[in-house]
Amino acid sequence: MEGERPRSDTVTTTVSSHMETISLGGSIAYDRSFLRSPTGVLLLMEIMFGLLVWALIAGSEYFLFSAFGWVMFVAVFYWVLSVFFFLLHLTRANTRITKVPWSLVGLCFNGSAFVLYLIAAVVEASSVNKDVHQHHNYNSWTASSFFAFIVTVCYALSTYFSFQAWRTKS
């Protein structure tokens, strides 16, 4: 027994997660579980309500007032990026591009969207004036302002979840 080494027990732990995917053909698949996740639900809400924000503004004479041009820019810019990120996560393409720090990208995207949408929503709400503008524009801009604040809350929640994901990966 003198030449024997002390015995060490090795414990191996494996963690598996079930990803429910449906293949739509050759290399395109989508992740159903993403649609049920908080991130997926928030992205869908940001896309739907963001579309309402810029559609309601686009249907009015927003180009006559620079404040509404700013709101339109923020709404369309972040709507396009939200659609991009939604498709990226839905198809799990982000897992195939490993060189990009996706948790940091998500945090920067959602944080900037929250700040700029908050500014745009406040600017839009303060620019709506029933006495000066036509009735149709007033209704559209009021509704758009309401939805802009809803999108702002969605981006704030997304920023929180992105921060949590970034903090756990750092």
Curated annotation (Swiss-Prot):
Q: Which GO terms describe its molecular function?
A: structural constituent of myelin sheath
Q: Which residues form the MARVEL domain?
A: 34-167
Q: Which UniProt keywords apply?
A: Membrane, Nucleus, Transmembrane, Transmembrane helix
Give an example GO cellular component term for this record.
membrane
Membrane topology classification: Multi-pass membrane protein
Q: Where are the transmembrane segments?
A: 39-59, 68-88, 103-123, 146-166
Topological domain (Extracellular) residues are 60-67, 124-145
| Listed InterPro entries | MAL, Marvel, MARVEL-CKLF_proteins
Ranges in the topological domain labelled Cytoplasmic: 1-38, 89-102, 167-170
Where, subcellularly, is it found?
Membrane; Nucleus
Please verify whether the record's keywords include Metal-binding: no
**Disulfide pattern:** none
GO BP, sorted A to Z: myelination
Protein name per UniProt: MARVEL domain-containing protein 1
Q: Give the source species.
A: Xenopus laevis
- Report the gene name: marveld1
